[in-house]
Curated annotation (Swiss-Prot):
Pathway: Amino-acid biosynthesis; L-histidine biosynthesis; L-histidine from 5-phospho-alpha-D-ribose 1-diphosphate: step 7/9. Its cofactor is pyridoxal 5'-phosphate. Its EC number is 2.6.1.9. It comes from Campylobacter curvus (strain 525.92). PROSITE patterns: AA_TRANSFER_CLASS_2 (PS00599). Pfam families: Aminotran_1_2 (PF00155). It is an enzyme of class 2 (transferase). This is Histidinol-phosphate aminotransferase. The modification N6-(pyridoxal phosphate)lysine is found at residue 227.
């Protein structure tokens, strides 16, 4: 059987290992496993949201309101934008897929950082687009502009991951806005701001204001409920852009693309600001501990504006350390698939991080 030729060079996205795998393979009880691989919220889900999901569970047989009116109203009020400027996705990565299907094709190219979220390339290759990456692993806007100017006739989509996953660095907001002014209005610029809450809390100069994006005709801001809001398992993301962009992307959206329970969870999550603040405060405090640990252990790391930190290694094998940690019930994210001798650690609660430090010390040479 012949398949779409664009699939030939594609590899599956490597997700963080689940707790169930560790239980099966190593016989460790689930309660003793610490998962710090997928940048989930270490406090879980807001208790208010859990109760809302329970209350709505009896309606699981019903399709959701496909207009997502209540959620869009809540997002619009929070960010100061209109409901027609918002699209809802099954995770923000679904909206990434919409963007590429809407703008990219085999005659066009997509521009991204040297090391960044893997799904940009996967979705781009699905539509047969060419990939351009910067020489630097981290975001360097001078390099972005250099490549853009050299291939203006090809590039149809540009991705900026702010802050960047899996490295953690983040550009200053002012330089991002200046960059956007240099890009032709027929090129769609996707600002993937899944970790924006963490960046903004740490340094206001790094936080993108989604309402500011509406000043640009060709830019879309992507946000998610998976990180700061603790709804990774609910799969809810959103995009904010000019109505002209949103209306085109909506043509690609299947009806009922998030569930009845996911919709209820997202609406309630926006109300619990105390839970989000608790999450951000813990992240900032515990991030400082990881940075101090890395300095003391002479581990290379990139200052992070996310809810994770990436440790890079020279002589030791990051994959070997990750595997050893896995056998002890601690799941980290080996970045071998990104061609890095590094692993990424989600910032956990204090007691979780204590165990990470203890086990890491046993593996460092």
């Amino acid at each position: 059987m012949k398949f779409n030729e664009n699939l030939a060079g594609l590899v599956n996205y490597e997700a963080g290992k689940p707790i169930e795998l560790v239980v099966r393979e190593f016989g460790i009880e689930a309660k003793d496993v610490i998962k710090l691989a997928s940048n989930e919220n270490p406090f879980g889900t807001s208790p208010h949201v859990v109760e809302a999901i329970k209350s709505a569970a009896s309606n699981a047989f019903l399709y959701p309101d496909d207009s997502y009116f209540e959620l869009k109203e809540a997002l619009g009020a929070k960010f100061g934008v209109g409901t027609k400027n918002i699209i809802i996705g099954s995770g923000s990565d679904q909206i990434i897929e919409f963007c590429l299907h809407a703008k990219a094709n085999p005659q066009s190219a997509v521009l991204m950082a040297g090391v960044t979220f893997a799904m940009y390339e996967i979705y781009a290759k699905q539509v047969g687009a060419k990939i351009y990456r910067t020489r630097s692993q981290e975001h360097d806007l001078a390099e972005f502009l250099e490549i853009y100017e050299a291939h203006k006739d090809e590039i149809s989509v540009i991705f900026l991951c702010l802050p960047n996953n899996p490295l953690g660095e983040c550009l200053d907001t002012k330089e991002v806005y200046e960059f956007l002014k240099r890009i032709d209005e027929d090129v769609l610029v996707v600002l993937d701001c899944a970790y924006n809450e963490f960046a903004k809390f740490k340094d206001a100069r790094k936080g993108i204001e989604s309402s500011e994006i509406l000043k640009f005709k060709n830019v879309i801001y992507l946000g998610t409920f998976s990180k700061a809001y603790g709804l990774g398992g609910m799969r809810v993301g959103y995009g904010i852009a000019k109505e002209s962009i949103i209306s085109e992307l909506c043509k690609l959206r299947a009806p009922f693309n998030i569930t009845t329970l996911s919709l209820k969870a997202a609406i309630e999550a926006l109300k619990d600001e105390e839970f989000v603040t608790k999450t951000l405060e813990n992240n900032l405090k515990q991030m400082a501990r990881y940075e101090a640990f890395a300095r003391e252990a002479d581990i290379e790391f990139i200052p992070s504006y996310t809810n994770f930190i990436t440790f890079k290694f020279d002589k030791q094998s990051a994959s070997e350390i990750s595997q050893n940690m896995l056998k002890k019930g601690i799941i980290l994210r080996d970045l071998k698939s990104y061609k890095l001798n590094a692993f990424r650690i989600t910032i956990g609660q204090s007691w979780q991080n204590d165990r990470v430090f203890e086990e890491l010390k046993q593996n460092l040479k």
